[in-house]
């Protein structure tokens, strides 16, 4: 098997196997070929990982942020040196085209290690509060053992986005990747260990929906950070609340992308395509409700159709390929069902809508699909599809489109394309979402916070804001004189 790791889990600085766990087969989405066979964590493996993290964390927390940061920056350097191999593994794991993974996956993970390794001494500062002759100060302290639960669309990136702020803040982490993409996180653990991270501080265990509750409900876990669907987020948040654990939830979305009639049309079309077809549409922040002002709708659709039908679908390891397969057969079938629902409910099919015939029949391929004349009540306009399906809706004026854009339970992202920057800022101020773009879409550098509102979650990934979610404030009052007591 072309991507078989040394063992299923990485615990306390070494690979660990336990064949008593349920078998997890890793399939290459382009062909359906089994590329690795692993085992889900048993309760004993979960205990072993959490015990290793708990044992290692106090000594790590006692190190200076600068010393911790040096290790993270070394890990970033190693990732960049091995970017090609890591990108190919990510493509095998996810089916995403190599032309994407080589610029967007391990590289963004390395950016996270470099960023947090460099800024933590400033980001973890406390404050001094003068109180007359007395004074107080605050300091940021780590939470302890953190659990990270990853999704299958950006497995290496997500592992790094969670590990970097957790580790630099002085925590230890047990990370569970998605069972669909189990391979990349093991390499991240290997690289961190090679960079000098002490044993037990970043552990990776495999698992499925039965493994998550063992982690979330464990009494030694202080924080849970999940990237996943809204239903999963609700279950995890409810379980974590039972023990008052800290939580970060980066969940799904049905985000609006608004194109006004004064926008640069080619840029707007490009933004809509990036916001719907990148990673074969498997991006939580995608702007899948594309609102186009009526006066430019015909020309917008004409250019969109031409560019969509020109996209190259094929082998993800071919650098010319622009669209790869879905991550799994089940996900493809889910997306196909949504496409059929769009047709049945009266949306106009502009492009795609079927299975491409120029690729392996065993792969999980689907054509990038555009629907027009979509109304707000259609299923494809209300529910997260998580595939390459764009819904184009038309609108008349600003107030109307803002009201319709906000009429969703989700609030992860949104975008505005317009030449009028006053209007752009006015609109984003009124949109109910955590992450917004003006004349751009789906750019998420590690320097800026990323996260949602409403049913799309809470807490923030990346930037200095992430440190607030992996640490807590300790307040110290210092009395400088005798205590005055009334008794």
Curated annotation (Swiss-Prot):
The modification Cysteine sulfenic acid (-SOH) is found at residue 284. Binds 2 potassium ions per subunit. It comes from the Bacteria. NAD(+) binds at residues 150-152, 176-179, 229-232, 252, 284, 384. The keyword NADP applies. K(+) 2 binds at residues 244, 454, 457. InterPro entries: Ald_DH/histidinol_DH (IPR016161), Ald_DH_C (IPR016163), Ald_DH_CS_CYS (IPR016160), Ald_DH_CS_GLU (IPR029510), Ald_DH_N (IPR016162), Aldehyde_DH_dom (IPR015590), BADH (IPR011264). It is an enzyme of class 1 (oxidoreductase). The keyword Oxidoreductase applies. The active site is at 162 (charge relay system), 250 (proton acceptor), 284 (nucleophile), 461 (charge relay system). One of its GO terms (molecular function) is betaine-aldehyde dehydrogenase (NAD+) activity. K(+) 1 binds at residues 26, 93. Its EC number is 1.2.1.8. GO terms for biological process: glycine betaine biosynthetic process from choline. Pathway: Amine and polyamine biosynthesis; betaine biosynthesis via choline pathway; betaine from betaine aldehyde: step 1/1. Keywords: Metal-binding, NAD, NADP, Oxidation, Oxidoreductase, Potassium. Gene3D superfamilies: Aldehyde Dehydrogenase, Chain A, domain 1 (3.40.605.10), Aldehyde Dehydrogenase, Chain A, domain 2 (3.40.309.10). NCBIfam families: BADH, PRK13252.1. Dimer of dimers. Belongs to the aldehyde dehydrogenase family. This is Betaine aldehyde dehydrogenase. It comes from Rhizobium leguminosarum bv. trifolii (strain WSM2304).
């Amino acid at each position: 098997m072309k991507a078989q790791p040394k063992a299923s889990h990485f615990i306390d600085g070494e690979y660990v196997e336990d064949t008593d766990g349920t078998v997890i087969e890793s399939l290459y989405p382009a062909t359906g070929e089994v590329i690795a066979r692993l085992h889900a964590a048993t309760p004993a493996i979960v205990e072993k990982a959490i015990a290793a993290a708990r044992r290692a964390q106090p000594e790590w927390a006692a190190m200076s942020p600068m010393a911790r940061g040096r290790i993270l920056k070394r890990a970033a350097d190693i990732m960049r040196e091995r970017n090609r191999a890591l990108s190919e593994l990510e493509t095998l794991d996810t089916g995403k085209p190599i032309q994407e993974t080589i610029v967007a996956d391990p590289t963004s993970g390395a950016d996270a290690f470099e960023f947090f390794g460099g800024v933590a001494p400033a980001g973890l500062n406390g404050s001094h509060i003068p109180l007359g002759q007395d004074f107080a100060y605050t300091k940021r302290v780590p939470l302890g053992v953190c659990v990270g639960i990853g999704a299958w669309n950006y497995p290496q990136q997500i592992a790094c986005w969670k590990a970097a702020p957790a580790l630099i803040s002085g925590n230890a982490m047990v990370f569970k990747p998605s069972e669909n993409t189990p391979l990349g996180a093991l390499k991240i653990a290997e690289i961190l260990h090679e960079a000098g991270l002490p044993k037990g501080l970043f552990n990776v265990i495999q698992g499925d929906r039965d493994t998550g509750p063992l982690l979330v409900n464990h009494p030694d876990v202080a924080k849970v950070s999940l990237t996943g669907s809204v239903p999963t987020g609700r279950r995890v948040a409810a379980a974590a609340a039972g023990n008052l654990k800290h939580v970060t939830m980066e969940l799904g979305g049905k985000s609006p992308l608004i194109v006004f009639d004064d926008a640069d049309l080619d840029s707007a079309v490009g933004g809509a395509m990036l916001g719907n077809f990148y990673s074969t549409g498997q991006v939580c922040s995608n702007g899948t409700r594309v609102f186009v002002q009526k006066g430019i709708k015909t020309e917008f659709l004409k250019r969109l159709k031409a560019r969509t039908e020109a996209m190259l679908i094929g082998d993800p390891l071919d650098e010319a390929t622009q669209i790869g397969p879905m991550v799994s057969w089940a996900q493809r079938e889910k997306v196909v069902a949504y496409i059929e629902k769009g047709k049945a409910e009266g949306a106009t099919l502009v492009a795609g809508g079927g299975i491409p015939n120029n690729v392996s029949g065993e792969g999980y391929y689907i054509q990038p699909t555009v629907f027009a004349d979509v109304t707000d009540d259609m299923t494809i306009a209300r529910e997260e599809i998580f595939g390459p399906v764009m819904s184009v809706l038309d609108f008349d004026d600003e107030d109307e489109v803002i009201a319709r854009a906000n009429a969703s339970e989700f609030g992860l992202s949104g975008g505005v394309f317009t030449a009028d920057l006053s209007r752009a800022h006015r609109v984003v101020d009124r949109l109910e979402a955590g992450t917004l773009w003006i004349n751009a879409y789906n750019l998420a550098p590690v320097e800026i916070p990323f996260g949602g509102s409403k049913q799309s979650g809470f807490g923030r990934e990346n930037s200095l804001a992430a440190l607030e979610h992996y640490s807590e404030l300790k307040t110290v009052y210092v009395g400088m004189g005798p205590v005055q007591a009334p008794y």
